[in-house]
Amino acid sequence: MGKIIGIDLGTTNSCVAIMDGGKARVIENSEGDRTTPSIVAYTKDGEVLVGASAKRQAVTNPKNTFYAVKRLIGRKFTDGEVQKDISHVPYGILAHDNGDAWVQTSDSKRMAPQEISARVLEKMKKTAEDFLGEKVTEAVITVPAYFNDSQRQATKDAGRIAGLDVKRIINEPTAAALAYGLDKNGGDRKIAVYDLGGGTFDVSIIEIAEVDGEKQFEVLATNGDTFLGGEDFDNRVIEYLVDEFNKDQGIDLRKDPLALQRLKDAAERAKIELSTSQQTEVNLPYVTADASGPKHLNIKLTRAKLEALVEDLVKKSIEPCRTALNDAGLRASDINEVILVGGQTRMPKVQQAVADFFGKEPRKDVNPDEAVAVGAAIQGGVLAGDVKDVLLLDVTPLSLGIETMGGVFTKIIEKNTTIPTKASQTFSTAEDNQSAVTVHVLQGEREQARFNKSLAKFDLSGIEPAPRGMPQVEVSFDIDANGILHVSAKDKKTNKEQKVEIKAGSGLSDEEIQRMVADAEANREEDKKFQELVQTRNQADGLIHATRTAITEHGSKVGGDVIGKVEAALADLETAMKGDDKAQIEARSKTLEEAGQSLYAAAAAAEQGGNADAASGNAQASKAADDVVDAEFTEVKDDKKA
């Protein structure tokens, strides 16, 4: 059995971890970072960028760069939260045929948020595979505790599109509790996990206990807001900067996607800087232009101003904490430890609000960016049998039930019920001789059915004619360990039964998922071909450089016909490199290589010829020297007198 990896699929950043030698280990991605931006971009060349590379080009390609899609996953286009998001993102959000919120590129290509999330999951999968040196097919993926059934299903679908068998979906705060509590001793204790991430907020009250030598993590209650997070804090800063610039220059930057993307980056940086300093400056030269010329944005932002801008958002996160405590039957003083998770919890104002509410300082020894992935990896280890003596008891975050006569929501499973769980209730017909009943499955807390989330509708037919109130129809709900619901309705008299796994009404059909899986596989093949083409181009480029160097060094030693062949092969290869035909580049590289070898051979021969001439000259000089006869000279005296 291969490794089951743990993935924190975040709104802003994602992270992957594995169990390694009995301990959870966060894996660095190909850029050497422990977290990866949850950003996917489509370039004009058809390349798909994921992570840091997508983030780097966002300013110049705003309409094709998708971020924070986790806030759209499993949602209807008409949802108030989705409508609110439309004005804050530069890319297109539109309604799919089934009413889902989908995204759209500048050339009108439509994609489900699940497809975008699948790209991020693929990157996490590849990161793990590169580290392990083996194929990875199984994963535990985390979701916000307050995700409903539709959002959980959609996350599973994203995993499937990415080529992953999602063994378990677990709640982010629960995963963080696992990461924190696995190696901690000190008896039973109750902890609060406050998780304020990039796009969602959750709070869970969890009891960690030793039961018969087994460490048990039991979620007592959970609450949250799936549309509250760091993105909202960023948007407050963006709104402030836009308003200030409008006052100063009379130009509304909301209408400029390029300027908005630059503002988003600047707002996020400013927010982060103000966690450690009291003041920062947002400086964006050439942010826009009008008839009078270019305009520059330069605005000072203090920590006090930032805190004033987001004060209501911080307060909004405290109410779910109060509800979760009440649901758990506890007071703030009963909580032993408070754990902070999610990047937004680095903000001093947030930390202070949490400390004030719970009456104790939150712990700082848990990495808010990595704890969730670590917990997911631990759960993966539990499922694989690598981690022993750990029991995780999670809960369903929202009540589940059906619509009954008069539009009433009748709960069958109450919120904060430990999962997996089953529950049944018997209902009857509303009219005489009714031969079928429609079961409308809902999720939520409102008394009126229409205000809750509709999950599915199905019919149980073949009921024998009888006066109203006589037939008995048993409706059973079964929630699995992933928090995903299965519903059945049975006529007790005839034993006719209708079962349905809730495929969220806002989810993808099997056909759509299969198409997306095929598309993802095709893209993986395309990406592989692209990498091979780049490698071939790089090798060809190196060959061209080496050949030009050889011409410079040896060109004067060889004949013009040899140089002519090399120059022609060079030109052919350079032409081929302007295209995308890998085979042609390889063929012309081979031709140039052969021409280059001819050049080296000719140069070597020329050098040998030169050496031979030199050797011949030396030989003749030697022979002349050999003809000289050694003799002794004596002075001859001439006695003749002139």
UniProtKB/Swiss-Prot annotation:
SUPFAM superfamilies: Actin-like ATPase domain, Heat shock protein 70kD (HSP70), peptide-binding domain. The modification Phosphothreonine is found at residue 200. GO terms for molecular function: ATP binding; ATP hydrolysis activity; ATP-dependent protein folding chaperone; heat shock protein binding; protein folding chaperone; unfolded protein binding. One of its GO terms (cellular component) is cytosol. One of its GO terms (biological process) is protein refolding. The keyword Ribosomal protein does not apply. Induction: By stress conditions e.g. heat shock. This is Chaperone protein DnaK. PANTHER family: HEAT SHOCK PROTEIN 70KDA. Belongs to the heat shock protein 70 family. InterPro entries: ATPase_NBD (IPR043129), Chaperone_DnaK (IPR012725), Heat_shock_70_CS (IPR018181), HSP70_C_sf (IPR029048), HSP70_peptide-bd_sf (IPR029047), Hsp_70_fam (IPR013126). Residues 603-627 are annotated as: Disordered. It comes from Xanthomonas campestris pv. campestris (strain ATCC 33913 / DSM 3586 / NCPPB 528 / LMG 568 / P 25). Residues 603-623 have a biased composition (Low complexity). Acts as a chaperone. Disulfide bonds: none annotated. Keywords: ATP-binding, Chaperone, Nucleotide-binding, Phosphoprotein, Stress response.
